[in-house]
Amino acid sequence: MKKIKVCIVDDNRELVGLLEEYIDAQDDMEVIGVAHNGQECLELVEQLEPDVMVLDIIMPHIDGLAVLERMRQMNKPMPNVIMLTAFGQEDVTKKAVELGASYFILKPFDMEYLASHIRQVSGKTTGFVRKSSSSFKTQEPKTKNLDASITSIIHEIGVPAHIKGYLYLREAISMVYNDIELLGSITKVLYPDIAKKYNTTASRVERAIR
């Protein structure tokens, strides 16, 4: 029997380990790759061509929505994507479905439930969405909820996820949220700090955001 090839993408390494162990214990599926950020995820798709991708929405570097956008542009078969999310904003859900997500599961969830939907989507085309929350308990840090809110707002105002300024803008909002005084030193502190994190220059950060 041909096994369903699954990739798992989440920046919560403990959760990834638990999911990998559970999925590999199933007779009809196997984990062929794991990633902890969006860039690693795109490399997995390029190299391994999974049947199903279990993908978290909020991740460092490139978030789940941007990953979906880039996968659509790749010259590779698009895997069936099950999105994991700790929040349920309708606008983000709708955007993800438009970009090709097959299914949404709300954290915390039951691993048996996830496995059943891996089986379901592996034989179906993309384009449907349901949301579920069940008994698997993994606590999401407060920063995750903040990132979710920021992502929702940026997508709502129409900033494309694939442009560089999107990444810098998300980082800037998060930094100002945690230290409001940064608003008084945007060019002297905020932009240089973002530039340092992403190995670029403050002027490039400013141009990208503007």
UniProtKB/Swiss-Prot annotation:
GO terms for biological process: detection of stimulus; phosphorelay signal transduction system; regulation of sporulation resulting in formation of a cellular spore; sporulation resulting in formation of a cellular spore. Its main location: cytoplasm. Ca(2+) binds at residues 10-11, 56. Its cofactor is Ca(2+). Phosphorylated by KinA and KinB. GO terms for cellular component: cytoplasm. Keywords: Activator, Calcium, Cytoplasm, DNA-binding, Metal-binding, Phosphoprotein, Repressor, Sporulation, Transcription, Transcription regulation, Two-component regulatory system. CDD domains: REC_Spo0A. Residues 5-122 form the Response regulatory domain. Gene3D superfamilies: 3.40.50.2300, Winged helix-like DNA-binding domain superfamily/Winged helix DNA-binding domain. Residues 192-210 bind DNA. The modification 4-aspartylphosphate is found at residue 56. It is found in: Cytoplasm. GO terms for molecular function: calcium ion binding; DNA binding; DNA-binding transcription factor activity. Binds 1 Ca(2+) ion per subunit. SMART domains: REC (SM00448). Pfam families: Response_reg, Spo0A_C. May play the central regulatory role in sporulation. It may be an element of the effector pathway responsible for the activation of sporulation genes in response to nutritional stress. Spo0A may act in concert with Spo0H (a sigma factor) to control the expression of some genes that are critical to the sporulation process. Repressor of abrB, activator of the spoIIa operon. Binds the DNA sequence 5'-TGNCGAA-3' (0A box). NCBIfam families: spore_0_A. This is Stage 0 sporulation protein A. The gene is spo0A.
